[in-house]
């Protein structure tokens, strides 16, 4: 045996090849090779093979052409003897066609601890061959990189190392190879050659695609559906399915350690066997004990810059560990008798909160492993009930970029780990179960229009998943079929797995754009969500606020199919304008009665989610405390003095203005949405930026302001509940049942911008 030097030669390879005796450079590897030894007898050919052990370098999450699993080819058998039936465990068959029309069938059988590979060739009509021509197979195996296949130099190779076929019938040739099962998984790659005494170089035969034949050993081709990770039909294997239309190569990277960044095994998926349409797939036995997985994609099959490219996360992974998919699935959860409150839309009273900010402050008096988590929200359910809340609207909880914040997700199927001390998944389920038991629904803000700049879908198939906007930013291609499917599957998953009651779609106007960014009158995604049977009982809310912009949302005519409610931006504008003394009575009257100018299109007033402040922009107390020139878009008024003050008159005016804003909000027909912290006067010192928001300070509830405003909100929600016939309506009031008054009990001057008084009388019973 002779040792090869890793520095020898000029070309890297990760193939064990039959018949090659030249030296080649293998990066970070050592291996031995021996001269082929051939012994003939009784239709059996025994050949000693090479052994490779690959040592992984420290490449972080970079693609490396390596495998630390040993591959040792023990023996090769060429025999016409049939296999015993009781030895057969699993059989996979592959059928190929050559360019000349011959059929090549390959059967991979698991026999106890070995793999038997039988190759059958039929319909062979060699051109220019004589009667002494024979068919041989030159083959090799590889794992991590199919482009490392060594060139088969038949002229310089020892002919004894070539494996001949034997006749199994008049029209069929056959050979059999056998490998030790512990050396799997790997690919067997081979070419056929017709040789004769007159033509020692032989006639090479490839597939009809002009490529080598290739079959997986120790794993199977798998199935293209469902996308993502799923269990095989017998529960003993993992099926991997991954969409990438423009990738020429996709490598499945498997990890056997949850702490390392280096793959234990890489399988370069074959585009003929492991690809159906635009989906790459493979099935791997669970017994190997892998714990994580990812993919490496290359759009240029000839690129040599493998190590510079990152390993990407499966978009459908439901459990994430260190930016890789986990092969440990979610543990079962006892939902008990959990049932959604299924509150009618018109009866909702919504509280918007940030999971971390709600209980992160030390004043929450929660243990450190509970504060700032889903469990923390569940612990504060009594505060929500005191406000009359029957639905919480959670700011995005998907795994997101910690640098950019929750409105820039990098994944759509898992809650962020920072919201659960041990298991964010179980922590969230416990929260939902607890809130449901108290009659509180759970609504999620979701972002499906853009992603974080890294760690998301980038590197998988950018031209399919993204499009460039006019601002040169990358936006998620929502209405492209595969992206639409991803979003639908995500929504269904949150409903079925986490019992979520509804969704508020941030930057909803971008859901209306086509694959090139053009405006669509009938966007496929919005329509599909509207009529999806699994989402039929969920509440759907469109919010046109753009996290990139941070300004007040633009008004967009949203296609709704009588299913979609909307965060009513026009309501916010008109109420703020009236309270600060700039609006007209007609606008306020329209908002109080349910915004008929927006929702008389087959929906109703209950589809209007009414807010006067939100998590971006000025908080409620800042709306009456700051109004500098830079805050012109906020439509605020400082009540006579900018910022903090000790002047009693200014403070009394501010308190009155806050009560005015809340009073209008809670007597308006539609759904009131209160923002976290507004009940106790949380301030950002006049900053409208989302990142300026402070955690909820629970001590402020005991202050004079906090106690008064909390009691006022509680009173207003009880009024709404008692007179649901007036304030919680699914249909608009008829004009004849509403009587309006000015301050002198005359008909109001609707367009008088100086008027500051408006009264109304409602006949609750329809006439």
Where do the model's predicted regions map?
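N-terminal chloroplast transit peptides
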Residues: 1-55, 60-67
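The feature marks proteins involved in alpha-glucan
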Residues: 47-129, 144-235, 263-266, 274-365, ...
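Short proline/glycine-enriched turn/loop motifs at strand-loop junctions of beta-rich domains
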Residues: 129-133, 243-249, 288
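Conserved, mostly hydrophobic/aromatic
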Residues: 137, 242, 295, 353, ...
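Carbohydrate-binding surface patches
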Residues: 237-248, 743-767
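Beta-strand-rich binding/interaction modules
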Residues: 242, 248-266
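Substrate-binding/active-site clefts of carbohydrate-active enzymes
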Residues: 354-534, 597
């Amino acid at each position: 045996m002779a040792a090869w030097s890793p520095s020898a030669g000029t070309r890297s390879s990760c193939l064990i090849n039959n018949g090659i005796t030249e030296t080649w450079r293998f990066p970070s590897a050592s291996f031995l090779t021996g001269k082929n030894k051939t012994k003939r007898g009784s239709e059996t050919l025994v050949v000693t093979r090479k052994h490779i052990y690959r040592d992984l370098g420290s490449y972080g999450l970079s693609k490396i052409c390596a495998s630390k699993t040993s591959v040792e080819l023990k023996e090769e058998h060429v025999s016409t003897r049939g296999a015993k039936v009781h030895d057969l465990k699993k059989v996979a068959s592959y059928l190929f066609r050559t360019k000349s029309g011959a059929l090549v069938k390959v059967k991979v059988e698991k026999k106890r601890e070995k793999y038997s590979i039988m190759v059958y060739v039929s319909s062979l009509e060699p051109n220019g061959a004589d009667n002494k021509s024979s068919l041989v197979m030159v083959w090799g195996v590889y794992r991590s990189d199919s482009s490392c296949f060594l060139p088969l130099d038949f002229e310089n190779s020892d002919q004894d190392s070539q494996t001949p076929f034997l006749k199994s019938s008049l029209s069929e040739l056959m050979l059999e190879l056998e490998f030790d099962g512990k050396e799997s998984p790997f690919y067997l790659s081979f070419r056929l050659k017709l040789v004769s005494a007159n033509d020692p170089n032989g006639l090479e035969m490839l597939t009809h695609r002009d490529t080598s034949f290739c079959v997986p050993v120790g794993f199977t081709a798998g199935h293209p559906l469902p996308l993502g990770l799923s269990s095989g039909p017998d529960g003993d294997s993992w099926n991997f399915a991954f969409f990438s239309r423009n990738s020429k190569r996709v490598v499945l990277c498997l990890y056997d350690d949850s702490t390392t960044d280096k793959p234990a095994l890489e399988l370069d998926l074959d585009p003929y066997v492991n690809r159906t349409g635009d989906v790459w797939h493979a099935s791997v036995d669970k017994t190997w004990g892998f714990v994580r997985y990812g993919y490496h994609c290359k759009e240029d099959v000839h690129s040599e810059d493998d190590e510079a490219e990152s390993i990407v996360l499966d978009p459908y992974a439901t459990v994430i560990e260190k930016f890789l998919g986990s092969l440990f699935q979610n543990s079962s959860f006892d939902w008990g008798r959990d049932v959604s409150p299924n509150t009618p839309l018109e009866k909702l009273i919504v509280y918007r909160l940030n999971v971390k900010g709600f209980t992160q402050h030390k004043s929450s008096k929660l243990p450190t492993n509970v504060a700032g988590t889903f469990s923390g929200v569940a612990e504060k359910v009594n505060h929500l009930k005191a406000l009359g809340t029957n639905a919480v609207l959670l700011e995005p909880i998907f795994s997101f970029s910690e640098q950019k914040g929750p409105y820039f997700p990098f994944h759509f199927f898992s809650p962020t780990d920072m919201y659960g001390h041990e298991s964010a998944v179980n922590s969230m389920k416990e929260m939902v179960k607890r809130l449901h038991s108290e009659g509180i629904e759970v609504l999620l803000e979701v972002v499906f229009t853009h992603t974080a700049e890294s760690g998301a879908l980038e590197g998988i198939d950018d031209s399919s998943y993204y499009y460039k906007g006019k601002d040169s930013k990358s936006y998620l291609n929502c209405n492209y079929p595969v992206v639409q499917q991803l979003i639908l599957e995500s929504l269904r998953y949150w409903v079925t797995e986490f019992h979520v009651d509804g969704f508020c779609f941030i930057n909803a106007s971008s859901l209306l754009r086509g694959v090139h960014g053009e405006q669509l009158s009938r966007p496929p995604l919005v329509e599909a969500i509207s009529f999806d049977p699994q989402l039929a009982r969920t509440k759907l809310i469109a919010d046109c606020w753009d996290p990139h912009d941070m300004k007040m949302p633009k008004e967009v005519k949203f296609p709704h199919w009588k299913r979609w409610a909307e965060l009513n931006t026009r309501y916010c504008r008109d109420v703020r304008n009236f309270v600060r003394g700039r609006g007209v009575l007609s606008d306020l009257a329209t908002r109080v009665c349910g915004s008929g100018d927006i929702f008389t299109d087959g929906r109703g007033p209950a589809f209007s989610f009414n807010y006067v402040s939100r998590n971006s922009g000025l908080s409620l107390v800042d709306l009456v405390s700051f109004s500098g020139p830079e805050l012109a878009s906020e439509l605020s008024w400082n009540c006579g003095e900018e910022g903090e003050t000790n002047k009693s008159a200014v403070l009394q005016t501010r308190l009155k203005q806050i009560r005015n804003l809340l009073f209008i909000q809670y007597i308006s027909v539609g759904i009131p949405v209160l923002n976290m912290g507004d009940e106790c006067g949380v301030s950002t010192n006049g900053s409208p930026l989302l990142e300026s928001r402070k955690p909820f300070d629970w001590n402020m509830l005991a202050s004079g302001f906090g106690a008064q405003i909390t009691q006022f909100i509680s009173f207003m929600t009880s009024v709404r509940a008692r007179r649901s016939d007036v304030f919680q309506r699914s249909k608009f009031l008829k004009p004849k049942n509403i009587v309006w008054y000015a301050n002198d009990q005359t008909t109001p001057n609707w367009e008088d911008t100086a008027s500051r008084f408006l009264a109304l009388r409602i006949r609750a019973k329809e006439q």
